[in-house]
């Protein structure tokens, strides 16, 4: 498509990685991306996190992206048998475009600091947060719409979480798994 703008909505979960434990989040995101020459672009938006232990958490991703051209012409040369129809159906749902992104995501955790957690063991130590992000997006284009799966590694650069009981320090590495729908214009 000749246009280079994209707006989308995504649901995701951030899962703790590594040794020990850490709070896990669910998020709804609205984002905007602009692509220029050579499919290099910039993506930003608003992430709204939902978690009982952390309260309200909002962040704004600032990511540089690179996207491949759409892969066209994946057609299975079938002979009309049932097996060829199955192969054609499978080829129609594989991703036909890929994106790599990296950047930083500053955010703000609202609500009282160091309060007793609702349903867990973690306390918010500092309101401001910042993560370094590195990820890929697998895209299934449908006309001007994109269905996608998003896999992003986040490393918290700020020390935001404390353990309510003891001196244990939660890890800072998270893997975000998301699905979304975007529109190109």
Residue ranges of predicted features:
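Polar/charged side chains located within well-ordered beta-strands of beta-rich proteins
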Residues: 5, 11, 26, 32-36, ...
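Predominantly the C-terminal beta-signal and adjacent terminal strand-loop region
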Residues: 54-57, 132-185
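Extracytoplasmic loops and strand-loop junctions of Gram-negative outer membrane beta-barrel proteins
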Residues: 11-15, 117-122, 161-164
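Helix N-cap / beta->alpha transition motif
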Residues: 10-12, 61-69, 180-184
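Short glycine/proline- and aromatic-enriched beta-strand/turn motifs that initiate or cap beta-hairpins
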Residues: 1-49, 184
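Gram-negative (and chloroplast) outer-membrane scaffold detector with strong preference
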Residues: 30-122, 126-132, 140-145
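Outer membrane beta-barrel transmembrane domains
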Residues: 7-12, 97, 103, 107, ...
């Amino acid at each position: 498509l000749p246009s280079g703008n994209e707006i989308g909505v995504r649901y995701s979960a951030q899962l703790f990685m590594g040794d020990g434990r850490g709070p896990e989040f669910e998020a709804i995101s609205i984002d905007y991306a602009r692509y220029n020459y050579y499919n290099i672009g910039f993506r930003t938006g608003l992430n709204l996190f939902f978690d009982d232990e952390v309260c309200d958490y909002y962040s704004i991703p600032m990511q540089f992206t690179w996207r491949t051209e759409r892969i066209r012409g994946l057609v299975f040369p079938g002979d009309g048998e049932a097996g060829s129809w199955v192969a054609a159906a499978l080829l129609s749902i594989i991703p036909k475009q890929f994106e790599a992104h990296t950047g930083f995501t500053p955010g703000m955790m609202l609500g009282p600091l160091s309060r007793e957690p609702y349903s867990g063991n973690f306390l918010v130590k500092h309101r401001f947060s910042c993560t370094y992000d590195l990820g890929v997006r697998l895209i299934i284009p449908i006309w001007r719409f994109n269905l996608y799966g998003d896999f992003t590694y986040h490393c918290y650069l700020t020390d935001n979480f404390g353990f309510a009981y003891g001196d244990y320090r939660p890890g800072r590495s998270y893997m975000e798994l998301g699905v979304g729908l975007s529109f190109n214009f």
